[in-house]
Amino acid sequence: MNKQAIDALLQKINDSAINEGNPRTKQIVNRIVRDLFYTIEDLDVQPDEFWTALNYLGDAGRSGELGLLAAGLGFEHFLDLRMDEAEAKAGVEGGTPRTIEGPLYVAGAPVSDGHARLDDGTDPGQTLVMRGRVFGEDGKPLANALVEVWHANHLGNYSYFDKSQPAFNLRRSIRTDAEGKYSFRSVVPVGYSVPPQGQTQLLLDQLGRHGHRPAHIHFFVSAPGFRKLTTQINIDGDPYLWDDFAFATRDGLVPAVRQAEVRKANRTAWTVSSR
């Protein structure tokens, strides 16, 4: 079919609407369908390829991996770059860079003031201590900002999704003090991979790509009257630090990490400072 015939078919489909519907939804869906029709024609996509793709998306949805696919195909990073561009055009600059949320946030984590311990004490990973501070765009510290933190355990698994972990393990919300400061104790997370037999890895194999993520810690930072920040920090030295399958590593999000002796416990702790 030529594009004129395709456009005529699309118009027939659009004309079948029995009421106005939602204009924005119609605009988006019609554009996506048009581009897919063009793709099928241009690449001579066969019926078995089309139905294989459709069934694949159904399987990915049932297994809860659509969020991983969105990250792995670069959609989340693309959305971040678009927001960066919009802010730059509006004259907004500076501050901690944003990066992807990922699909593993869980609302309702316990709230602490100033400091929190994220782990339940059973994880054998190395101790991690992080201290940070939240500032407004004017450079003044923000008191009572909410810092939500979550990360994987020493096996690369997240509580709630990993039923062997207690509820909200390695997940906390911390309110900053009068000087905008917060801190937490946890364990050093490790990098992990998408499920090796899952739908995401199945597609990545077809694309000749890996599904590894470097060790990282997720953050939401919010305060009344300010834009909510969604970001992560990465643990320096991870072999996939700059080869993240989700494209989340960004300059400014790899803080210095150093080892420090914890004398009372006779242990070594990793400390992170984030201004």
Swiss-Prot record:
Induction entry: By aniline.
GO-annotated molecular function: catechol 1,2-dioxygenase activity; ferric iron binding
Enzyme class label: oxidoreductase
InterPro entries xref list: Catechol_dOase_N, Cchol_dOase_prob, Intradiol_dOase_C, Intradiol_dOase_core, Intradiol_RC_Dioxygenase
Reactions accelerated catalytically: catechol + O2 = cis,cis-muconate + 2 H(+)
Pathway: Aromatic compound metabolism; beta-ketoadipate pathway; 5-oxo-4,5-dihydro-2-furylacetate from catechol: step 1/3
Family: Belongs to the intradiol ring-cleavage dioxygenase family.
Protein name, UniProt field: Catechol 1,2-dioxygenase 2
Organism: Acinetobacter lwoffii
High-level lineage: Bacteria, Pseudomonadati, Pseudomonadota, Gammaproteobacteria, Moraxellales
